[in-house]
Amino acid sequence: MPVVVVMGAQWGDEGKGKFVDLLAERAQVVVRSTGGSNAGHTVWAGGRQYKLHQVPSGILYPGTLCVIGHGVVLDPPKLLEEMDRLASQGVDLSSLRISGGAHIVFPFHIRLDEAEEDRKGDRKIGTTRRGIGPAYMDKFARVGIRLVDMLDRDEFLPKLTALVEEKNRILEKVYGLPGFTVEEIAEPYLEYAERLRPYVANTVELVNDAIDAGKNVLFEGAQGHLLDIDFGTYPYVTASHPIAAGAIIGAGVGPTKVSRVVGVVKAYTSRVGEGPFPTELHGEEAHRIREEGHEYGTTTGRPRRIGWLDLVMVRYACRVSGITDLAVPHLDTLAKTGLPTLKVCVGYRMPDGTVTREFPVGLKALSQVEPVYEELPNWEWSAEMSTARQYDELPEGARRYVRLIEDVTGVRVSILGVGSERTQAIYRSAIF
């Protein structure tokens, strides 16, 4: 039963888009089932760059069924803008299907997100200010509006009226900001709904039918494990579940149907936004990695925080999500930095002097750990590295780096990335 979940095993931005794109070539169905427009994938194909936020990466393969599931919060104008951009690049969108059960992000969600981040000042979470958290709040408060509601004017308008009245009270009385009229939201969003209507389908049936028929089904995770609302560095997290279990919950698929879970682990660590970061680097080392790795947010454009690879974090992700295979991109980036020595965190030294590989639950405990590093010599960059397609063609230094990852996590590294193009990858084990 070839059902594969691809998820980020760090703080997002690991390079999932490349590996989803690679695996999508062998998939008949690609599913995006968590998060919203706050997540971003950049895929290179044929020398052309495609930036994806809400549309599954499989859309670049004609005929591949691409599904946006229940668990996603949709930003309709952003989604339609993305669809129009892809269409202008020659991408066929006829295979896209969207769940009517997906909740909607409205302008008042975005304004509330911005207002709360501004109010917190130095204590801000570092959200993308896309309204994702407030939209999920409405979902779990059972007052949210779903795409299926927007398709029925008589169903939509009373729900929107009640929600606008509630949000206006908060915006005006708590934040001193102007609210919205029902009319300024209703008419454009009803138009968005009509544009999306041809793509709406019963995605639970579509995905489960495909699985039952033995088709290759790929679940495309958004963000990363350490941003999970339950298992991440709370409260510096997203409002959904980027772990493997979240991918199948958001699509309406049972856990027994998953055959492989691929965790994507960047060869170093990056983070956007606030929160603890035990292996964070500053100065020249961080600058070199950031520039060689083009570490600027797909969604925000913000420079990402950079640090050494943290295998305590990755081991934690492997345990929580039952990761069966690791995919490691950016081996080429480390070589290109020219840094003579690389560090890998293999444990945390606690304040009492003990060393552990357990990831702490509390922020205070995490902020007090001292990374225990293993130092390895960097490998020299050469053009041959990006043309390597066999593991033994890699420099010995890179292979030693991979072995250390496997030793600490206990999980095989099955795919390696040696460049930004989709073809620049090494398979050590077939996923599909």
UniProtKB/Swiss-Prot annotation:
The active site is at residues 13, 41. One of its GO terms (cellular component) is cytoplasm. Pfam families: Adenylsucc_synt. It is an enzyme of class 6 (ligase). It comes from the Bacteria. Homodimer. Belongs to the adenylosuccinate synthetase family. Gene3D superfamilies: Adenylosuccinate Synthetase, subunit A, domain 1, Adenylosuccinate Synthetase, subunit A, domain 2, Adenylosuccinate Synthetase, subunit A, domain 3. InterPro entries: Adenylosuccin_syn_GTP-bd, Adenylosuccin_syn_Lys_AS, Adenylosuccinate_synth_dom1, Adenylosuccinate_synth_dom2, Adenylosuccinate_synth_dom3, Adenylosuccinate_synthetase, P-loop_NTPase. Its EC number is 6.3.4.4. This is Adenylosuccinate synthetase. GO terms for molecular function: adenylosuccinate synthase activity; GTP binding; magnesium ion binding. SMART domains: Adenylsucc_synt. Substrate binds at residues 298-304. Pathway: Purine metabolism; AMP biosynthesis via de novo pathway; AMP from IMP: step 1/2. GTP binds at residues 12-18, 40-42, 304, 330-332, 417-419. Its cofactor is Mg(2+). It is found in: Cytoplasm. Plays an important role in the de novo pathway of purine nucleotide biosynthesis. Catalyzes the first committed step in the biosynthesis of AMP from IMP. Mg(2+) binds at residues 13, 40. IMP binds at residues 13-16, 38-41, 128, 142, 223, 238, 302. PROSITE patterns: ADENYLOSUCCIN_SYN_1, ADENYLOSUCCIN_SYN_2.
